[in-house]
Design a protein with these regions (language model features):
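C-terminal-biased regions
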Residues: 1-20, 27-108
Length: 108
């Protein structure tokens, strides 16, 4: 996909929205903003952006697990329903995309 001139700013806007929603306790909204950032980073093959999404998803889940364990997608709540947390799945998705991207050093 060709680079859109505003793709980088869209990525940053998604991260800003994620942080604002997370700070306000709107965890599901924060998740979706972070997922949107993941899709933008993937489209741009932005390894730094993908790594940032992976890190943020993991960090935010850790905070949720401590401060809001009753939230439906905390580790405890998600596992009680037999599923992993959506934040964990987002971190794993970012990791999987990173593994599939071409090596930046030009390896084939």
């Amino acid at each position: 996909m060709p680079e859109h001139p505003d793709a980088s700013s869209l990525f940053e806007q998604c991260l800003v929205l994620n942080r604002e929603a997370f700070a306000a306790g709107y965890y599901s909204t924060a998740y979706h903003a972070l997922a949107a950032a993941l899709h933008l980073a993937h489209a741009r093959q932005d390894t730094e952006g993908l790594s940032e999404v992976e890190r943020m998803a993991s960090e935010q889940l850790a905070v949720i697990d401590i401060t809001a364990p009753a939230y439906e997608y905390s580790t405890r709540s998600a596992e009680a329903s037999g599923l992993p947390s959506i934040f964990l799945m987002l971190a794993r998705e970012a990791q999987a995309i990173l593994r599939r991207l071409p090596d930046e050093q030009g390896s084939v």
